Structure formats: C-alpha cells, structure tokens
C-alpha cells in the first residue's frame, strides 16, 4: 500500500523493471455477480473461487449495509477471499442519504442502511477489520446544491477518518455527478472543495463516457485523483452495461493515458451480468487487447 498522500502507484514506480506489470492487476466489483452472492443459501467461498478462476486478482464489494458482507463478518469474508487467492481492496457504501418520498408506504419507517453520514466509524472499523485499504462511497444525495455541499462535508470527514486508520477514501461516480446544478457539477465541487490527498475519485469509465465526458480530459484536469477505476462498457445501441470490449468505451485511449490518473486498482463491473461468463469475457478481452 502507498503511504498516505503519495501520488505515485507502486506499479508505476516499478515500471522500469522487466517484470513490472504495465497496468494494475485485473479486479472485479463483485456487485457484478450479486445475483449469485446474494442468493439464498449462497456458497460465498465457492463463488469467490469461481471469481479467482477467471483471472481476477482483486475484488471490491458493495454490501455491508447491515454490518455483514455477503453474510459474513468482515474478517471472515476477508479470510475467505484470501484463501481463494483474492485481495479485498474496499467496499461500497452510501454517502449522504437521499430524502425518501412521503407516502403511505414510505421507506422512511424502515431501518436505514448504514451510510457515511451516520455510521462512518463503524464503516471504517469494518474496513480495517477486513484488511481493506479503501473506503468507497457508492453514491450520495446530490440533487440540489445544498446536498452537494453536505455531501462534500461528509467526504471530508470520511477522508480524515480513513487516513487516521491507514486507509483512503474515494467517491464513485454515476452520470448525475456531471449534471449542472446552479452553475456547478457535483463532480467538480467535490474535487475542488476537498483535500486532494484525502478525497479521491473512483472513476466509472462508462458512466463518465455516457455523461459526455472524456476520462482522459478528467485525468488532465485533476491529475492523480483517480487511483480507482470501474472498467465498464456500454452497448452501442442500448447504452446498457455489456462485457468490456463489446461496447462504445474507448479503453485503449484511456489506458494509454492511465499514468495521468494515478490509477492503482481497476475493477471490471457489469450491472445486469447474466452469469460469470460475462466478467470472464471482459478479463479475456483486457488481457488480449490492453494487458498484452
């Protein structure tokens, strides 16, 4: 793991070596296979082994809202991952909660999942117990300028606490982070109103592309702020997530300029994947076309 505040990933430092990898190891956001991991009676260890068998080295999760990680305490889940040859890098959790719509069946009366505003200490404690190096916000309320400002405040606290526990904090984008709200975007506001050594972005390459953004232009605008990537593709016709290399995202252009971003970990993600063959084909395409 890098020292806190360092902007040069280990794989870049070692690039002169004949055995150094050109890019970070291929990882997977296991939300891609949530239909397996969240199924009743799921064999978590067996599923993690299947993930390792397709060539994945690192994983990111999207769970823990109730303190369990696919039914396991963080230490147990981390041990399962390690036993199958996987390294657990971090977990997605919500940021500033959205205000639920008022109705007779409003979800407001239900227990709220843990989030960074209300449960940051427990979330960081879980990440530390699991040996994670990152705490990641999956999404946050950003529909108004006030929400954007409050989201940034939550992220400042998350970045501080993560650093105090030898971890780092990142925010994962969707398309809405690039919407103009009272003359600003949540994406720009967060990056210009937080400490660049404590608050980073996990850039979802597909959703940034769908929002009309060039990821490389973002790297140039905010160099070193993108140590985490979601490597996701979008179907050229439907705009829905599809296996990497079969859609419209220009991965060769992006990876060629990866050093600008400060990338350390890349995670394949495919919302709506039908089976493990989908991420397996993404791994193979990356190995044949990017990691060759």
For each feature predicted by the language model, list its residue ranges:
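Acidic-and-aromatic substrate-binding clefts and catalytic sites of carbohydrate-active enzymes
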Residues: 34-41, 62-73, 95-101, 111-117, ...
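Active-site acidic/histidine proton-transfer and metal-coordination neighborhood
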Residues: 3-7, 18, 98-200, 276
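Non-transmembrane, interaction-prone segments in cytosolic or luminal domains
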Residues: 69-70, 74-76, 81, 134, ...
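Histidine-acidic metal/acid-base catalytic patches
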Residues: 4-11, 15-27, 35-52, 131, ...
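Hydrophobic faces of well-ordered beta-strands that scaffold small-molecule active sites
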Residues: 24-30, 59-61, 88-93, 135-137, ...
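Aromatic side chains
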Residues: 31, 56, 92, 169-174, ...
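N-terminal pre-domain/capping segments
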Residues: 2-129, 133, 163, 284, ...
């Amino acid at each position: 793991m890098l020292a806190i505040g360092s902007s040069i990933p280990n794989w870049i430092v070692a690039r002169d070596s004949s055995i150094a990898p050109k890019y970070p190891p291929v990882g997977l956001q296991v939300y891609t296979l949530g239909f397996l991991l969240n199924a009743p009676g799921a064999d978590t260890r067996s599923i993690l082994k299947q993930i390792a068998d397709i060539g994945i080295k690192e994983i990111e999760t999207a769970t823990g809202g109730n303190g369990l990680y696919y039914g396991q305490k963080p230490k147990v889940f981390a041990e399962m991952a390690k036993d199958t040859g996987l390294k657990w890098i971090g977990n997605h959790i919500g940021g500033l909660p959205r205000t639920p719509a008022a109705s007779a069946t409003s979800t407001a009366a239900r227990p709220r999942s843990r989030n960074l505003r209300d449960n940051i200490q427990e979330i960081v404690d879980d990440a530390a117990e699991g040996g994670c190096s990152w705490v990641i916000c999956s999404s946050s309320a950003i529909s108004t300028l006030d929400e954007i400002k409050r989201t940034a405040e939550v992220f400042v606290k998350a970045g501080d606490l993560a650093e105090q526990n030898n971890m780092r904090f990142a925010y994962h984008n969707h398309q809405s982070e690039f919407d103009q709200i009272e003359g600003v975007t949540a994406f720009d506001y967060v990056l210009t109103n937080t400490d660049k050594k404590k608050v980073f972005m996990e850039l979802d390459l597909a959703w940034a592309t769908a929002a009309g953004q060039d990821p490389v232009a973002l790297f140039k605008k905010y160099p070193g702020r993108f140590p985490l990537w979601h490597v996701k593709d979008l179907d050229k016709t439907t705009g829905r997530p599809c296996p990497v290399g079969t859609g419209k995202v220009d991965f060769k252009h992006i990876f060629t300029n990866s050093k600008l971003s400060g990338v350390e970990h890349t995670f394949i993600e495919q919302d709506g994947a039908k089976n493990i063959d989908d991420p397996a084909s993404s791994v193979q395409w990356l190995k044949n076309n990017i990691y060759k």
